[in-house]
């Protein structure tokens, strides 16, 4: 897993940047719940449709959302590939923490050494 983290850091960095903005997180959570158009998303958010489009572009560039044509509009949905990149990155650190915990638990107490 170390190799993965070293080979693809730009993917993870762009995901953290994309999710670092509260409006983008809200948009991402909404499209993760169900596919939506820009108009649907903008209807409930305190930002304009052009701003929603810009946020979606950042999320799409990070690999977190994808879009498809539906008539004269685009429908956005969660892209699982971006989440897989983030999960692999976080799993790397989780596995390190678990290994360190296992080592600590398996060591005899100091008075028994």
Region spans (language model):
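Short, Lys/Arg-rich nucleic-acid/phosphate-binding segment
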Residues: 69-75
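Short alpha-helical elements of helix-turn-helix
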Residues: 13, 19-25
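Conserved strand-loop elements at the edges of beta-sheets that form or border functional pockets
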Residues: 21, 67-69
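C-terminal regulatory/oligomerization modules of transcriptional regulators
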Residues: 1-15, 30-44, 49, 58-62, ...
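Short basic coil micro-motifs at the edges of alpha-helical modules that engage polyanionic partners
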Residues: 16-17, 75
């Amino acid at each position: 897993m170390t190799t993965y983290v070293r080979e693809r850091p730009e993917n993870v960095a762009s995901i953290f940047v994309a999710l670092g903005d509260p409006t983008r997180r809200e948009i991402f959570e909404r499209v993760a719940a169900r596919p939506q158009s820009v108009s649907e998303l903008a209807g409930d958010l305190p930002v304009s449709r052009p701003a929603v489009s810009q946020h979606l572009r950042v999320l799409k560039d990070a690999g977190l959302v994808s879009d498809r044509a539906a008539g004269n509009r685009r429908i956005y949905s969660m892209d699982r590939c971006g989440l897989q990149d983030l999960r692999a990155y976080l799993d790397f650190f989780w596995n390190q923490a678990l290994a360190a915990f296992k080592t600590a638990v398996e060591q005899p107490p100091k008075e028994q050494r």
